[in-house]
Amino acid sequence: MEKTEIVRKYVEKLINSPINLTAYKDFDEAMAFLYLDSVLPVKSEDLGEFFLDIGTGGGVPGVFLSVEFDKKGLLVDSICKKVHFIQQTCKELGIKKVETLCARAEELKGKGDFFEKFDSAVSRAVSKIATVLELTAPYVKVGGKLLLYKGPGYNEELGQSVNAMKELGVKLSEVRRYSIRGKDRFLLVFEKISHTPDKYPRRIGIPEKRPIR
């Protein structure tokens, strides 16, 4: 099956699933705001051999990144029926390089050798920047990238994340602005510049309730 056909079929299954996986029910809108929004800003990035997608939901952006760039990815979500959807749909469509795990990001420390294992991490519409950095940075190798998809209101969050960046060993290297159907979107590219203390991420719920300040 051609890559384009795989993507189109995956989008069709996303919007038609009885599980509430996306607010987009129109195929063309879903192709724009789910698929294109996932891959367009990342075309100039090297995800490395193995990337992590935290809070993947129905597999966005992880499935599309894996298919588009032929990369291996671990897609993590705490809602098991969403993870099951990804597993079944990838099997049906012959998507080979997607692995899945039903877990909270905070739980990865206890579920395998994931600390500083990944070449990159991605996250889309999960939480505020400081929280997402705590949930991703511990699992990315030094020299790796953290890619956060954000809307126009990211500036205030970024200002509140300065101490989190220092504590977690990451720095902001680029803010990439792009447009999907006339709507401004931003990809925040962080670089992992030093080892993250192994006390991170903190236990379940704490990164959200008490972000590093």
UniProtKB/Swiss-Prot annotation:
GO terms for cellular component: cytosol. Its EC number is 2.1.1.-. Keywords: Cytoplasm, Methyltransferase, rRNA processing, S-adenosyl-L-methionine, Transferase. InterPro entries: rRNA_ssu_MeTfrase_G, SAM-dependent_MTases_sf. Its main location: cytoplasm. One of its GO terms (molecular function) is rRNA (guanine-N7-)-methyltransferase activity. Pfam families: GidB. It is found in: Cytoplasm. S-adenosyl-L-methionine binds at residues 55, 105-106, 124. PANTHER family: S-ADENOSYL-L-METHIONINE-DEPENDENT METHYLTRANSFERASES SUPERFAMILY PROTEIN. Specifically methylates the N7 position of a guanine in 16S rRNA. Belongs to the methyltransferase superfamily. RNA methyltransferase RsmG family. This is Ribosomal RNA small subunit methyltransferase G. It comes from Fervidobacterium nodosum (strain ATCC 35602 / DSM 5306 / Rt17-B1). The gene is rsmG.
